[in-house]
């Protein structure tokens, strides 16, 4: 048996050198063709296949002798590699078309099959694709990690800055609280000091806060009601209006009394013209009870206006007037003039106060009194003689009151008015007062109204000039 194995080995080596069949095929052919091992492996009845009868003994005895291993499964895989196939499912019978008994030369036609990598290549390609996908995902995750780390670093820096700002704000708030506490402590200490309170009160009293509390009076047009014979007062205005009118009448009566005193005989007499506005639709700033804007202007500017010479003229009634009958006497008017601060009514007629820029001649107290009484007598004589004309004039005023505002009448040149309104060279104080008086827009409107009244009262004016 050893000699047979030696011969087979020599033939195999010779076949390999001459390019014969594969050593596995030669060894298998010799192992099957050995008759001494027919109980383990032998040819089939057709001599074109071989049968392994006992695979356990085959693995234990024959495989280590020919192939140096005892793995039956590995032997079967090798058979499959060279094209052998199992033909009987019940036993281990293998067949190859060129593996036939007594035809050993056909073994050179059996070739080893090339390994088919159809099953191995797809896993390799899929592995590469998966590896590429995984690598791409890893790169993406790395980029996201870097961005997150940058944001985290930025947030840490912002946290440090915010913490610093918070500390500064806390210090600032603490400083403000300390200042407030110090201020409150100082105020408590100062209030307890009577000297400080006294000095503070003096400072407050010295402050001129009247300018902040002043309110400008808006023009208010009062609608006068037709006077009745039974009534003596026109109560169209309210209580506040009456109080201001009473105060003004008191001041006006005091001025009138001072003019008649001898102490004021040497002072310049300046007169203002105050006319009624209810019957002609004028602003209440020019009426007697509401206050003269020129008088207010001279009071604010502090011009040294002297007490004025007063003349009585029948130019209309005031907004709040006392009704006089045609048989009213001079004594009744004088009594009302002297007691105007005690009564709530106004004069039955306006006092025309005209401004003279030049100083009037010096008169004694007796001359002033005589002149005033003479003017009063002349005025009331004119009132008695022109009672009917006044009634007619009131009706015309009531009908044409709106026309006076729409088309102001032309100014009438008269010798009596020109001697007072014409500017004369005189003292600088009177010139300053005259310029201030002429620059007032209320005076221009009143002059226009004076012109319309002068047209209706020309006869009375002529009597006054006599």
Curated annotation (Swiss-Prot):
Segments carrying motif Nuclear export signal: 461-466
Chain span(s) of sequence motif Bipartite nuclear localization signal: 198-217
Post-translational modification comment from the UniProt entry: Exhibits temperature-dependent phosphorylation.
Gene3D superfamilies to which the protein is assigned, alphabetical: Winged helix-like DNA-binding domain superfamily/Winged helix DNA-binding domain
UniProt keyword annotations, A-Z: Activator, Cytoplasm, DNA-binding, Nucleus, Phosphoprotein, Stress response, Transcription, Transcription regulation
One GO molecular-function entry: DNA-binding transcription factor activity
One CC-aspect GO term: nucleus
Span list, region Disordered: 215-248, 272-300, 422-466
SMART domains registered for this protein in UniProt: HSF
Cellular location(s): Cytoplasm; Nucleus
Record region (Hydrophobic repeat HR-A/B): 125-191
Biased composition regions of type Polar residues, renumbered to the chain: 425-438, 455-466
Main subcellular location: cytoplasm
Lineage top rank: taxon: Eukaryota
DNA-binding region residue numbers: 21-115
Pfam families noted in UniProt: HSF_DNA-bind
Motif (AHA): 414-423
Subunit structure: Homotrimer.
Domain notes per entry: The hydrophobic-rich region (HR-A/B) corresponds to the oligomerization domain. AHA motif is a transcriptional activator element.
Function description: Transcriptional activator that specifically binds DNA sequence 5'-AGAAnnTTCT-3' known as heat shock promoter elements (HSE).
Protein name: Heat stress transcription factor A-5
Source organism of the structure: Arabidopsis thaliana
Lineage: Eukaryota, Viridiplantae, Streptophyta, Embryophyta, Tracheophyta
Gene name for this UniProt entry: HSFA5
